[in-house]
Curated annotation (Swiss-Prot):
Organism: Caenorhabditis briggsae
Subunit note: CPSF is a heterotetramer composed of four distinct subunits 160, 100, 70 and 30 kDa.
Sequence ranges of Acidic residues compositional bias: 432-441
Basic and acidic residues biased stretches: 414-425
Any GO CC annotation of this UniProt entry: mRNA cleavage and polyadenylation specificity factor complex
Gene symbol of the encoding locus: cpsf-2
Record keywords, A-Z: mRNA processing, Nucleus, RNA-binding
Protein name according to UniProt: Probable cleavage and polyadenylation specificity factor subunit 2
Pfam families according to UniProt: Beta-Casp, CPSF100_C, Lactamase_B_6, RMMBL
Lineage summary: Eukaryota, Metazoa, Ecdysozoa, Nematoda, Chromadorea
Amino acid sequence: MTSIIKLKVFSGAKDEGPLCYLLQVDNDYILLDCGWDERFELKYFEELRPYIPKISAVLISHPDPLHLGGLPYLVAKCGLTAPVYCTVPVYKMGQMFIYDLVYSHLDVEEFQHYSLDDVDMAFEKVEQVKYNQTVVLKGDSGVNFTAMPAGHMIGGSMWRICRITGEDIIYCVDFNHRKDRHLSGCSFDNFNRPHLLITGAHHISLPQMKRKDRDEQLVTKILRTVRQKGDCMIVIDTAGRVLELAYLLDQLWANQDAGLSTYNLVMMSHVASSVVQFAKSQLEWMDEKLFRYDSSSARYNPFTLKNVNLVHSHLELIKIRSPKVVLCSSQDMETGFSRELFLDWCADQRNGVILTARPASFTLAARLVELAERANDGVLRNEDKHLSLLVRKRVPLEGEELLEYKRRKAERDAEETRIRMERARRQAQANESDDSDDDDIAAPIVPRLSEKDHRSFDAIENDSHCFDIMAKWDNQQKASFFKSTKKSFPMYPYIEEKVKWDDYGEVIKPEDYTVISKIDMRKGKNKDEPVVVHKREDEEEVYNPNDHDEEMPTKCVEFRNRIEISCRVEFIEYEGISDGESTKKMLAGLMPRQIIIVHGSRDDTRDLYAYFTDNGFKKDQLNTPVANELIDASVESFIYQVSLSDALLAEIQFKEVSEGNSLAWIDARIQEKESIDNMLVAGASQLTIEDSLQEDAVEVVEEDVIPMETFQDDQNKQEASEENVAEGEKSNGQSKENDENASSIPIETQPKIRGTLILTPLPKKQIPVHQAIFVNDPKLSEFKNLLVDKGYKAEFFSGTLLINGGKCSILVERLDSKWRVLSQKTFTNFGSCSTTSLLFCK
């Protein structure tokens, strides 16, 4: 092992924070995940910022925000340009996760960290890969990586990173070896004793229920809630584990014996329709049983979800009658529909809340999990029923704030109208005839638009199917200074567009096939006219939280509210992560040479560390870093990269050995090639010394030659000039201060930058005598062929190698699998093939 391997931990070690690690393999830097949580702390991004120009690739393991939530920020605000690698489902579902996150925050606050455009720009850098597809890192480093199924979420990956020399680095966090309804479990069969294992200890010390018992408990709690005429909210993520629960509940609703078909099943998020649509097209990433055909021999897609209602807003949810079961995002309940529904439903004792995961301890969901574990069959204790929560929401403007908003909006509208009218006036002037004698052409009259027509004018101006018969002002600016009898664009202007073609024919523009599907009655100030909204026939209507900004102005408010929890609160684990006992056995079975434990609380990390030490692993093989810690995972304590000089390569004499390989002795010494920075510093110091000597010499000569009177006059002039430029020097003093400080530092005390280490050839007098070595296992038959090539007569006779008709012989006896020399007659004139002792192996 000769590679330099280091791991820098930025977040996600001995805590429940987002995951972000920087792996260094020689000169390549690979970023392993870049998550973010609801706290949106910028600390670890600032620590990561200096390394961003060095990053060669980013590997994303799972689509949830804890693994890729910080990617848009790194691309938009930190300047990340390296390619991002993930599987196809992680790419699609990751976008859904981040979209839902941004929409949820825009519903209650002004989200400033990144926008939807930043999300799109970040995912444009993603290169999608498949399982078991080997991707070679760009450059000549020889580093490649492969995604292996993790079994936790659709498309979730464990990454195997290899060098060309064959050393493996395994990065596996949040994996599941058990088979789910829609996913197959992970497998470690393809991993053979890696050099470094980077793994997580997330919830490794917590017990887990069996799948059958867990499903029965879920159905029981749902039935108890809906039969009491209550609504049941199941808190789940946006596009990951929600597929498992949606598929399970859809099957239960389809089963008439379950007794759930009379109630409504709802999946609620800002991107619910898109999540289901993507799931339909990603069956190849799921378990093989989902490819089976139904009884009608037609292809059956299990994620059609016929019994699930997809909603994207509260208005759509209200239209669905109660009792109902709602799969609601987000999982930590810090924002999103899950928090809003909890605030609305917690006061009714008929309702129920089922939590399916243990998020970070600072979240509302984590507090409710603790209360549920202390509760009696979902009913909280009296001392646990009251919580003080921060409530954030958007409210419409009222009173003075609304008047101020209308005043500013009127000013903006007036300015926009003035600009449009000025543009129209210039276009009208451009259409006037250059020929003053032509009375048939009248200048077009542009009527002044009233305040009521402003919105209609915008609709016409923005419509892609409307054309202005007046020539554009920009075209008229290119006309000649002299009058021309030829009119530019006398009638309807027409510019023929070049039709684009591809392999399938003419490229279709979707906007050419839009239809007017509905009339949106949006009432502004004194505007009752309808606004035409264009919509594609196959386009689904997705809730956009910014739509209400056009209807009425709003503002974000927040306040503390003390709530009473009367509903049932229960916890059923559906995280899809391997249990602790199985995780320990699988990781120990890999027999890695070094282990780095990340992504887990201090107790979980300590538990996994103790298991490894009790099962034969040495303490120097285990590392449990904390945030902002650098781990050196190289085998040798000191590794340096050395280059071969051209002079050494010219003197090397290679000898061919078996299987096309070549070997050579290298007799050289290690020298440090001075870096360019040191050469520049040395050159600057030399120039500084020479300049100072020249200045001193000039001053001495001038003092010897110049008379005293002239010197006194020059001194007076110099004092006067110094007074005149005093102000200028004062203004430039700040900028010169740094240069003076830098120049005042002695050159010798400045740090020396290490240069490149190279191997240079030794003088021939210093080259030692090399002893003979044997490469591989020599065979007696090969030695016979060598003698024949040298002109000797050699043949086998009863286990004896006869040379030159018996004049020189070697008596060989076979003992087990060895050839042992029993006796040997020396002979002369054998040249380079003479030897005094031989040991041949079969």
